[in-house]
From Swiss-Prot:
GO biological process: cytoplasmic translation
Protein name: Large ribosomal subunit protein uL6
One Pfam family hit: Ribosomal_L6
Claim: Ribonucleoprotein is one of the keywords in the record: yes
SUPFAM superfamilies: Ribosomal protein L6
Length: 177
């Protein structure tokens, strides 16, 4: 039984929510997002809270119940506060800079990697070894951060590469003579 799905999602102050069938729309200070729930769950707006219920007792419906509730909570947090993901760059000569709206990365290749910033995402470079990805859509922020990290993920011997802030790299020992 889903414990997550049972709790109604309170609409935060400063956010207006509307439910139209399976579509939940949220407008807030950061922007507007919507989520279309699966057909196996029902979504209602009651007493300034969104209530998600499964339509039947199937295992599939129960799985989508908790997921739908979490997605609604994510769009509320996104339009109110937004999401951000920090990346760190380790390595000699590895650095990042902004070239207009594009992110330019020097990661030890023969050429610089240029990453085009998608619509709805803001990328900032406070230091040459730090990248901050922010936006209102949690999935999109995580996807962009993962794409940037993928160019040169951290390697286990020296820890060089792009990693998430706070990520722990499991280090390996080098060859012994």
């Amino acid at each position: 039984m889903s414990r997550i799905g049972k709790k109604p999602v309170q609409v935060p102050a400063g956010v207006t929510a509307s439910v139209d069938g399976q579509k939940v729309t949220a407008k807030g200070p950061k922007g507007e997002l919507f989520f279309v729930a699966n057909d196996e769950v029902s979504v209602k707006l009651e007493n300034n809270a969104v209530v998600v219920q499964p339509l039947n007792e199937s295992k599939d419906a129960r799985a989508k119940w908790g997921m739908s509730r979490t997605m609604v909570e994510n769009i509320f947090k996104g339009v109110k506060d937004g999401y951000e993901r920090k990346l760190e760059i380790n390595g000699v000569g590895y650095r990042a800079s902004m070239q207009g709206k594009n992110l330019q990365l020097a990661l030890g290749f023969s050429h610089d990697v240029v990453y085009q910033t998608p619509e709805g995402i803001t990328i900032a470079v406070p230091k040459p070894t730090e990248i901050v990805v922010s936006g209102i859509n949690k999935q999109q922020v995580g996807q962009v951060a993962a794409e940037i990290r993928e160019y040169r993920g951290p390697e286990p011997y020296k820890g060089k590469g792009v990693k998430y802030a706070g990520e722990r790299i499991v280090r390996k020992e080098g060859k012994k003579k």
